[in-house]
Amino acid sequence: PYSAFRKNKTWFGVSINRELYSTLAAHEATHAVAACNFRIAKPTIQAKEYLAYVAMFSAMSAELRAQALRGTRTEGFTSLDRFTPLLYMFDPMRFGAEAYRHFSSVADQTALIQDVLAGKVLSE
């Protein structure tokens, strides 16, 4: 619930508020939708989280997204190979911000989503 989330004070360097909380709901809803649409038996954590973070950042207002991206150290990954389970486990905020920045730079985003769901990318 929101009251528990609010105890964190900040997330992605942004003060906790209801708008930020609603993007967390988008993140979790994406997990549920993706789970029904993966075409492989065991998608990787990086595949699941990449999609969820892209949806979360996409659900943010432009102003909130800019604040969250500024509050997170990123390099601007150009390769999906950089999205590893270790990055997610040790720095999930960075993983999420990098995922959104990467996805935003992809010309055919629909094809990328299909490739993730098919296990063609972000796999073991």
Predicted features and spans:
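Intrinsically disordered, low-complexity N-terminal regions enriched in serine/proline/glycine
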Residues: 1-4, 20, 52, 87, ...
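Active-site scaffold of zinc-dependent metalloenzymes
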Residues: 1-18, 32
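Extended hydrophobic/Leu-rich segments
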Residues: 5, 49, 113-116
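Soluble non-cytosolic domains of exported or imported proteins
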Residues: 15-24, 42-47
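Active-site recognition of the HExxH zinc-binding catalytic motif
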Residues: 23-36
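Post-HExxH zinc-binding segment in Zn-dependent metallohydrolases
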Residues: 44-76
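Long, well-structured alpha-helical subdomains associated
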Residues: 63-124
